[in-house]
Amino acid sequence: MNLCDKYTKLVVRTNADTPHDAEVARNFGAVGIGLCRTEHMFFENEKIKAMREMILSGTKEGREKALAKLLPYQKQDFYGILKAMDGHPVNVRLLDPPLHEFVPHDLAGQKTMAEEMGISVEEIQKRVNSLSEANPMLGHRGCRLGNTYPEITAMQTKAILGAAIQLKKEGFDPQPEIMVPLIGIVNEFDLQEQVIPVSYTHLTLPTKRIV
């Protein structure tokens, strides 16, 4: 491998969504992360609860309250991944899948969610059904989620760059990149580009735009 490294012009990044996977990949020679899928981080117990609260909330205030619960979890995940890849780029994809993938579709799960949120099962079912789509692969997902609910993009941006700043203060060299997913037309990107800088104006980390 040392001989290959001496002559190669090709570098290999990995796909990794956890600090452990990032560390393993680096030990095998990966020089960064080409795709870090943030949706995979939301399926642990407390995270999925907060995620579902955010999705099923009927108000912006309710979504922001749930996202405030998710923020420290996201920051912790990104901290571990960026630390494992110290000095190498980590390309983080903002939330991509349609929201119906995160909500309970079984009656038992819906009853539990109703109890946790203090609303009726019928209301939970109504909100879950409202998320169904004719073409979920190209519908309300990716950048369109971020444009409909910019508070999601804001939370993830704060988590990514907040983790990077913490590592900088500790003497590490984090190299975060943010991917805005599923852009169809430039207007969709423009809307997200308005949200992302506002989310880190209170932070002190040099950033650059790559399209």
Where are these regions (language model features)?
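Conserved alpha/beta-domain cores
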Residues: N2-L205, R209
